[in-house]
């Protein structure tokens, strides 16, 4: 084809996509922000500086729960592990990785993964805002205290940029 194509409006499935990696290779058992590939630990105020406006359109998570213990009796609750994708420290997408908010869902040590997608425009950001990922671990105390130790955490966030 010898001419340029011009579209007035949004093309479904169109847009430039970017993929941002976050992770932690060491062990941790409390809430923390994940690092970027350069090893710099992100915070609620420091993450990937987004080069242009767009939307968060997908998230993929893989973790290894290297150690899991419950709260002992009477209810034997397990820690709740949640991954949160944030823009400038504000939650955009939250997904349970293991357990339940009330501690009632049990799980074993081992690898766990999940992924989720959403439509363009659901969770948006502006150029210059910061993208970061936080892993939140909530423990429960009864006769003992539940705990989960994570290692080898990898999170990939897909963003679709506006034209």
Where are the regions a protein language model picked out?
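Short, surface-exposed beta-strand/strand-loop-strand elements in extracellular ectodomains
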Residues: 72-90
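Noncatalytic modules at the cell exterior or secretory-pathway interfaces
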Residues: 121-141
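Short consensus segments that form the blades of beta-propeller domains
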Residues: 69-77, 145-148
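Glycine-rich, low-complexity segments
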Residues: 1-41, 82-84, 92-103, 109-111, ...
